[in-house]
From Swiss-Prot:
The gene is aroQ. CDD domains: DHQase_II (cd00466). GO terms for molecular function: 3-dehydroquinate dehydratase activity. Its EC number is 4.2.1.10. It comes from Xanthomonas campestris pv. campestris (strain ATCC 33913 / DSM 3586 / NCPPB 528 / LMG 568 / P 25). This is 3-dehydroquinate dehydratase. The active site is at Y23, H101. Keywords: Amino-acid biosynthesis, Aromatic amino acid biosynthesis, Lyase. Pfam families: DHquinase_II. SUPFAM superfamilies: Type II 3-dehydroquinate dehydratase (SSF52304).
Length: 148
């Protein structure tokens, strides 16, 4: 059994109502509940945290180093394009992570095309709406099974 951590960046608490044509109508609570259930069905635990504050996400990443977390799933949202702090925290704890996006940043505004995390991620899944999270979790579960 592995302990997994799912982090959501700024404004993702508004999922379901914020720009549904871009992000869909599924709420963050619905996404989290489905992923917790799937992780448990695979014999793993999943903790979920959303924050609009960069330092809260950084501190939770630091805590993951000590709490037995085996893998981090992260939708950094707008921090994707701005946060050296998240990059440094993820590199500092040395845990594998998957970068997730609901939309495909490469089909959007040019400032969204660069990620400070992608080149260090075990994988990047984007463009599938709420299914991006499910696909990311399935990839993590498969990797954990392969590596065990």
């Amino acid at each position: 059994m592995a302990h997994l951590l799912l982090l959501h960046g700024p404004n993702l608490n508004l999922l379901g109502t914020r720009e549904p044509e871009v992000y869909g109508r599924t709420t963050l609570a619905q996404i989290d509940a489905a992923l917790v259930d799937r992780a448990q069905a695979a014999g793993h635990t999943l903790d979920c945290l959303q924050s609009n504050a960069e330092h809260v996400l950084v501190e939770r990443i630091h805590a993951a180093r000590e709490d037995g977390t085996a893998f981090i799933l992260i939708n950094p949202a707008a921090f994707t394009h701005t946060s050296v702090s998240l990059r440094d925290a993820l590199l500092g704890v040395g845990l594998p992570f998957v970068e997730i996006h609901l939309s495909n940043p490469h089909t959007r505004e040019p400032f969204r095309h660069h990620s400070y995390l992608s080149d260090k991620a075990a994988g990047v899944i984007c463009g599938f709406g709420a299914d991006s999270y499910r696909l990311a979790l399935e990839a993590v579960i498969a990797r954990l099974e392969r590596d065990s």
